[in-house]
From Swiss-Prot:
The keyword Calcium does not apply. Catalyzes the transfer of a ribosyl phosphate group from 5-phosphoribose 1-diphosphate to orotate, leading to the formation of orotidine monophosphate (OMP). The gene is pyrE. This is Orotate phosphoribosyltransferase. It catalyses: orotidine 5'-phosphate + diphosphate = orotate + 5-phospho-alpha-D-ribose 1-diphosphate. Belongs to the purine/pyrimidine phosphoribosyltransferase family. PyrE subfamily. Homodimer. SUPFAM superfamilies: PRTase-like (SSF53271). Orotate binds at S124. It comes from Staphylococcus saprophyticus subsp. saprophyticus (strain ATCC 15305 / DSM 20229 / NCIMB 8711 / NCTC 7292 / S-41). 5-phospho-alpha-D-ribose 1-diphosphate binds at R94, K98, H100, E120, D121, L122, I123, S124, T125, G126, G127, S128. Its EC number is 2.4.2.10.
Amino acid sequence: MAKAIAKALLEIEAVSLSPNDPFTWSSGIKSPIYCDNRVTLGYPEVRQHIRDGLCDLIETYFGDVEIVSGTATAGIPHAAYVSEKLALPMNYVRSKSKSHGKQNQIEGALSKGKKVVVIEDLISTGGSSITAVEALREAGADVIGVVAIFTYGLKKADEQFKQAQMPLYTLSNYNELIDVAKENGEISDNDIRSLVDWRDNLS
């Protein structure tokens, strides 16, 4: 599964590698990799594969889930696909409360007293996922885990999830992506060293 997802993300250019001409993230970080899983929405077969994989993770590790929750905004469509297949209620969590109306941070199914799994598209530092987890907990939810499409495998993310005592499972990861890119002849051994060094030094 991890290899197939990595291959698909590379093929549709949801993930791009550029060791010699780094991308600039919105945070200002210079990175040899850029991941935009929103691209998957334009590829029905890929998004169905992702949906089925996320469902498998949830059924394997969080079989007693009662609500699926997506992180705004990129996690929302995948949460919708998963909740539809599993026939479960869904909500989504904003990064902060609205400034108008009822000022809700969580929209959709009520979480209080319910076992909830959070769906995220991408794990970088883990900040957005943990923000969603904390908001759901404040609303009285029993958040039992997070599942995501892809992770960079940064130590900061590992530390955040550990501190929050929150299990995390992903469909694919940085190491798998590098392996697939090498098999495809897209990167050299020097590129691999550069990619690994970036991840380890950023951590």
